[in-house]
Protein backbone atom coordinates (compact mmCIF):
# COMPACT_ATOMS: atom_id res chain seq x y z
CA UNK A 1 0.00 0.00 0.00
CA UNK A 2 1.31 3.48 -0.83
CA UNK A 3 2.02 5.71 2.15
CA UNK A 4 0.39 9.08 2.72
CA UNK A 5 3.73 10.77 2.00
CA UNK A 6 3.98 8.97 -1.34
CA UNK A 7 0.46 10.03 -2.29
CA UNK A 8 1.37 13.64 -1.49
CA UNK A 9 4.42 13.38 -3.75
CA UNK A 10 2.27 11.93 -6.51
CA UNK A 11 -0.25 14.75 -6.15
CA UNK A 12 2.56 17.32 -6.39
CA UNK A 13 3.90 15.73 -9.59
CA UNK A 14 0.54 15.51 -11.32
CA UNK A 15 0.46 19.11 -12.68
CA UNK A 16 3.85 18.52 -14.32
CA UNK A 17 2.21 15.90 -16.53
CA UNK A 18 -0.62 18.18 -17.68
CA UNK A 19 1.10 21.08 -19.46
CA UNK A 20 -1.01 21.72 -22.61
CA UNK A 21 0.45 20.94 -26.02
CA UNK A 22 0.38 24.59 -27.24
CA UNK A 23 2.72 25.56 -24.41
CA UNK A 24 5.03 22.66 -25.23
CA UNK A 25 5.10 23.88 -28.82
CA UNK A 26 6.04 27.39 -27.69
CA UNK A 27 8.82 25.93 -25.56
CA UNK A 28 10.25 24.20 -28.61
CA UNK A 29 9.81 20.70 -27.21
CA UNK A 30 8.95 19.22 -30.61
CA UNK A 31 12.09 19.82 -32.59
CA UNK A 32 12.24 18.24 -36.02
CA UNK A 33 14.78 15.48 -36.46
CA UNK A 34 17.74 16.71 -38.50
CA UNK A 35 18.44 14.21 -41.25
CA UNK A 36 19.22 10.50 -40.92
CA UNK A 37 20.90 9.16 -37.81
CA UNK A 38 22.74 5.94 -37.07
CA UNK A 39 21.09 5.85 -33.64
CA UNK A 40 17.85 4.01 -33.07
CA UNK A 41 15.43 6.60 -31.62
CA UNK A 42 13.74 6.05 -28.29
CA UNK A 43 10.04 6.86 -28.65
CA UNK A 44 8.35 8.00 -25.42
CA UNK A 45 4.61 7.36 -25.04
CA UNK A 46 2.75 9.15 -22.25
CA UNK A 47 -0.18 7.87 -20.25
CA UNK A 48 -3.90 8.50 -19.77
CA UNK A 49 -5.10 12.11 -19.45
CA UNK A 50 -1.53 13.40 -19.68
CA UNK A 51 0.71 15.19 -22.16
CA UNK A 52 4.35 14.83 -23.10
CA UNK A 53 5.26 17.34 -20.38
CA UNK A 54 5.59 14.46 -17.91
CA UNK A 55 8.49 13.16 -19.97
CA UNK A 56 10.52 16.38 -20.22
CA UNK A 57 12.90 15.67 -17.33
CA UNK A 58 13.40 12.05 -18.39
CA UNK A 59 13.89 13.16 -22.00
CA UNK A 60 16.58 15.64 -20.95
CA UNK A 61 18.34 13.09 -18.75
CA UNK A 62 18.40 10.48 -21.51
CA UNK A 63 19.58 12.99 -24.09
CA UNK A 64 22.46 13.87 -21.77
CA UNK A 65 23.48 10.22 -22.04
CA UNK A 66 23.46 10.40 -25.84
CA UNK A 67 20.10 8.86 -26.62
CA UNK A 68 17.99 10.18 -29.46
CA UNK A 69 14.44 10.90 -28.24
CA UNK A 70 11.20 11.26 -30.18
CA UNK A 71 7.95 12.50 -28.60
CA UNK A 72 4.90 11.70 -30.75
CA UNK A 73 1.85 13.89 -30.28
CA UNK A 74 -0.97 11.43 -29.70
CA UNK A 75 -3.49 13.43 -27.68
CA UNK A 76 -4.95 12.98 -24.20
CA UNK A 77 -5.98 9.30 -24.43
CA UNK A 78 -9.56 9.91 -23.32
CA UNK A 79 -12.27 9.28 -25.90
CA UNK A 80 -10.52 7.02 -28.39
CA UNK A 81 -9.92 3.30 -28.39
CA UNK A 82 -6.36 2.22 -27.75
CA UNK A 83 -6.27 0.57 -31.18
CA UNK A 84 -6.85 4.01 -32.72
CA UNK A 85 -3.99 5.47 -30.68
CA UNK A 86 -1.67 2.71 -31.91
CA UNK A 87 -2.59 3.57 -35.49
CA UNK A 88 -1.94 7.24 -34.75
CA UNK A 89 1.49 6.28 -33.45
CA UNK A 90 2.16 4.37 -36.69
CA UNK A 91 1.22 7.45 -38.71
CA UNK A 92 3.46 9.68 -36.60
CA UNK A 93 6.48 7.40 -36.98
CA UNK A 94 5.92 7.12 -40.72
CA UNK A 95 5.58 10.90 -40.99
CA UNK A 96 8.89 11.31 -39.16
CA UNK A 97 10.59 8.61 -41.25
CA UNK A 98 11.30 6.42 -38.21
CA UNK A 99 11.75 2.90 -39.55
CA UNK A 100 13.06 1.26 -36.38
CA UNK A 101 12.67 2.38 -32.79
CA UNK A 102 12.72 1.49 -29.13
CA UNK A 103 9.34 2.08 -27.50
CA UNK A 104 9.08 3.29 -23.90
CA UNK A 105 5.53 3.65 -22.66
CA UNK A 106 4.32 4.86 -19.28
CA UNK A 107 0.95 3.55 -18.09
CA UNK A 108 -1.53 3.50 -21.01
CA UNK A 109 1.29 4.54 -23.32
CA UNK A 110 2.84 1.12 -22.79
CA UNK A 111 -0.37 -0.55 -23.94
CA UNK A 112 -0.32 1.59 -27.08
CA UNK A 113 3.31 0.60 -27.62
CA UNK A 114 2.50 -3.11 -27.26
CA UNK A 115 -0.21 -2.89 -29.92
CA UNK A 116 2.15 -1.06 -32.26
CA UNK A 117 4.84 -3.72 -31.73
CA UNK A 118 2.25 -6.40 -32.43
CA UNK A 119 1.21 -4.75 -35.69
CA UNK A 120 4.72 -3.67 -36.77
CA UNK A 121 7.06 -6.29 -35.27
CA UNK A 122 9.98 -5.52 -37.58
CA UNK A 123 9.97 -1.85 -36.55
CA UNK A 124 10.50 -2.32 -32.80
CA UNK A 125 13.82 -3.44 -31.31
CA UNK A 126 12.80 -3.15 -27.64
CA UNK A 127 9.61 -2.47 -25.72
CA UNK A 128 9.94 -0.93 -22.26
CA UNK A 129 6.80 -0.78 -20.12
CA UNK A 130 6.88 1.68 -17.23
CA UNK A 131 4.04 1.00 -14.78
CA UNK A 132 1.78 -0.41 -17.50
CA UNK A 133 -1.61 -2.01 -16.65
CA UNK A 134 -1.45 -5.09 -18.88
CA UNK A 135 -4.17 -6.71 -16.76
CA UNK A 136 -6.00 -3.44 -16.22
CA UNK A 137 -6.22 -1.04 -13.29
CA UNK A 138 -8.93 -0.98 -10.60
CA UNK A 139 -8.84 2.84 -10.78
CA UNK A 140 -9.95 2.73 -14.42
CA UNK A 141 -13.50 2.29 -13.10
CA UNK A 142 -13.38 5.84 -11.74
CA UNK A 143 -12.86 7.14 -15.28
CA UNK A 144 -15.87 5.25 -16.64
CA UNK A 145 -16.67 8.30 -18.81
CA UNK A 146 -13.57 7.59 -20.91
CA UNK A 147 -13.56 5.15 -23.83
CA UNK A 148 -9.84 4.60 -23.27
CA UNK A 149 -10.14 3.92 -19.54
CA UNK A 150 -13.03 1.49 -19.97
CA UNK A 151 -10.74 -0.76 -22.02
CA UNK A 152 -8.43 -0.95 -18.99
CA UNK A 153 -11.02 -2.04 -16.44
CA UNK A 154 -9.97 -5.50 -15.17
CA UNK A 155 -11.90 -8.19 -17.01
CA UNK A 156 -12.44 -6.17 -20.18
CA UNK A 157 -12.10 -8.48 -23.23
CA UNK A 158 -9.54 -6.05 -24.68
CA UNK A 159 -7.02 -7.19 -22.05
CA UNK A 160 -7.07 -10.84 -23.11
CA UNK A 161 -4.44 -10.18 -25.78
CA UNK A 162 -1.82 -9.61 -23.07
CA UNK A 163 -2.30 -13.02 -21.44
CA UNK A 164 -0.53 -15.17 -24.03
CA UNK A 165 3.04 -15.12 -25.38
CA UNK A 166 4.04 -11.74 -26.77
CA UNK A 167 3.43 -11.74 -30.55
CA UNK A 168 6.71 -10.04 -31.51
CA UNK A 169 10.41 -10.85 -31.18
CA UNK A 170 11.54 -7.55 -29.69
CA UNK A 171 12.91 -7.83 -26.16
CA UNK A 172 10.42 -6.56 -23.61
CA UNK A 173 10.97 -5.13 -20.13
CA UNK A 174 8.33 -4.37 -17.52
CA UNK A 175 9.40 -1.80 -14.94
CA UNK A 176 7.15 -1.76 -11.89
CA UNK A 177 6.84 -0.78 -8.24
CA UNK A 178 5.04 -2.41 -5.33
CA UNK A 179 4.00 1.09 -4.23
CA UNK A 180 2.42 2.05 -7.57
CA UNK A 181 -1.02 3.25 -6.49
CA UNK A 182 -2.49 2.90 -10.01
CA UNK A 183 -1.04 -0.33 -11.39
CA UNK A 184 -0.64 -3.33 -9.04
CA UNK A 185 2.36 -5.62 -9.53
CA UNK A 186 0.09 -8.41 -10.76
CA UNK A 187 -1.20 -6.14 -13.51
CA UNK A 188 2.20 -4.78 -14.53
CA UNK A 189 3.66 -8.21 -15.25
CA UNK A 190 3.86 -9.21 -18.90
CA UNK A 191 4.49 -12.72 -20.15
CA UNK A 192 7.82 -12.93 -21.96
CA UNK A 193 9.11 -9.65 -20.51
CA UNK A 194 11.96 -9.19 -18.08
CA UNK A 195 10.72 -7.73 -14.80
CA UNK A 196 12.54 -4.73 -13.30
CA UNK A 197 11.42 -3.77 -9.78
CA UNK A 198 11.74 -0.18 -8.55
CA UNK A 199 9.86 -0.57 -5.28
CA UNK A 200 9.19 2.56 -3.26
CA UNK A 201 8.18 4.68 -6.25
CA UNK A 202 4.66 5.83 -7.07
CA UNK A 203 3.04 5.73 -10.50
CA UNK A 204 4.19 9.22 -11.53
CA UNK A 205 7.46 9.02 -9.62
CA UNK A 206 8.50 6.36 -12.13
CA UNK A 207 8.79 9.22 -14.64
CA UNK A 208 10.91 11.48 -12.45
CA UNK A 209 13.16 9.29 -10.29
CA UNK A 210 16.91 8.97 -10.89
CA UNK A 211 16.43 5.27 -10.15
CA UNK A 212 14.33 4.99 -13.29
CA UNK A 213 17.05 6.69 -15.32
CA UNK A 214 19.62 4.24 -13.95
CA UNK A 215 17.40 1.26 -14.77
CA UNK A 216 16.76 2.56 -18.28
CA UNK A 217 20.47 3.11 -18.76
CA UNK A 218 21.06 -0.57 -18.07
CA UNK A 219 18.24 -1.63 -20.38
CA UNK A 220 19.25 0.71 -23.19
CA UNK A 221 22.99 0.32 -22.76
CA UNK A 222 23.66 -1.28 -26.12
CA UNK A 223 20.84 0.22 -28.19
CA UNK A 224 23.19 2.25 -30.41
CA UNK A 225 25.47 -0.63 -31.26
Please place each PLM-identified region on the residue numbering:
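Short active-site-adjacent structural elements
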Residues: 182-185, 205
